[in-house]
Amino acid sequence: MLDKEAIKELLSSRFSNDIHTKLSEIPLPCELKDTFKAAKRIKEAIQNDELIAVVGDYDVDGIVSTAIMAEFLTDMSANFIIKIPNRFKDGYGLNEDIVKELDHATLIITVDNGISANEAALICKQKGIDLIITDHHMPPPILPQAYAIINPKQANCPFPNIEICGAQVAWYLIGALKEVCELRNYDMAKFLDLLTLAIIADMMELRDLNRILVRLGLARINSSKRACFEAIKNYYNKEKFEFDDISFLIAPLINSAGRIDDATISYEFLRSRNLKEANGYLDKICEFNASRKAQEKALFESSQNDIDENEDIIVTWGNEWHEGVIGIVASRLAKKYKKPAIVFSIDGERAKGSARSVGKFDILSLIASQESLLCGYGGHKGAAGIVIESANLNKFKTAINQSCFLQELYDFSTNDEILGQINPEAIDYELIEILEFFEPYGQKNPRPLFELKGAMVKSAKRIGKEESHLKIILQKD
């Protein structure tokens, strides 16, 4: 039976290896390879009034990365444009067509993408465009030929072994620019509200520097003067947002524009100058979110028709399934079946897939083992994107399950963590304060679960707009 001191000790032990626990202690920009080389080139471009193009991504991390870089460049009165690729028209990240579209720029900066853009980098070189890549995805064996590459995962980068998102990499570049441009009073903390959206949405580990940034960022969101947050507070009729609100309400909302239409609308929403402008963009985003929910529900149901529950890896596909929601469906399948899931949308001779993992299982490495069958892939240990010839789908499904079976050890266990058994009398305001002290909960700091023995359900009632929550009153046996 756990007492409160034991609960404190168990939760404290999760952070025993954390080094950076204060904002003043977090790693410096100089610890990211090429950061100051990139900053000096950007400073030169600003001073010479060169046209700078910022190329982002269509998820929350990419949208936020673009927004904070745009805010800094605006503060510097720089000459710049932004391009967030359209999922359906442009595809993912910097590519040849986007370089051609931006060939009037002399400097291109990627945020949350670019580490695999080898062909696009060559075209930049041919056109005399300097390319600065900022990314956090796993680098390929051969890096693009860029002017500078800022990625904590690249070789010979002294940055600590902590998973950070694309917006954080962009934020660190701005930190280097602050030094290079001698902006002593420039407020780097003003980006923490937006940064927190990206860290939570991209499911970064909530330990070490990520933990302190999110704790401070949540406070910033709740006191933020940005029109976008004021509009969101009004929409949800909430004055205070917590981690779960960001994760389950705000992040999916902002993501929906890129999933259904164009992520640039969410970028403009985050950059809104006043409440009227923010409300206009929010109305559009809410329509996209409603459409996303409807399509997600339909696809989730149809995706389960051909699932073999005996296989280690769920692989399913369909003709012209909506590309914007297959990632969410993969997440839901992984959660339901407690095993990794890959969902493909077939469009003629090619299929695009989205993979989601569970527990500590490295889905990206497993996908990489089937590289000979793929047209392309990329991502993280927990999530990945795939492009494959439609004719190879059955081969891929068989091969990836065989590859998983041959691995002697694999961990599909989820992050749900039952700390132990507690006495009902221990559930009081003091316990709530203890649990609140160790917030925010998320990756690597799962919300603690407790076991009650001998408790009976006295009443149960569905609550909420969609009756998706259950209010239970328990009675001691």
Q: What is each residue range found by the language model?
A:
Residues 143-182, 188-201, 208-210:
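Short alpha-helices
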Residues 403:
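Helical lid/core segments from catalytic subdomains that handle acyl or acyl-like groups
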Residues 136-137, 152, 322, 380, ...:
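Histidine-centered active-site/metal-ligand motif
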Residues 68-167:
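Hydrophobic, small-residue-rich alpha-helical packing segments that form membrane-like cores
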Residues 2-107, 127, 178-398, 409-417, ...:
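Hydrophobic helix-and-loop "lid/oligomerization" segment in the mid-to-C-terminal part
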Residues 223-226, 406-477:
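A contiguous loop/helix-start segment that scaffolds small-molecule binding in enzyme catalytic cores
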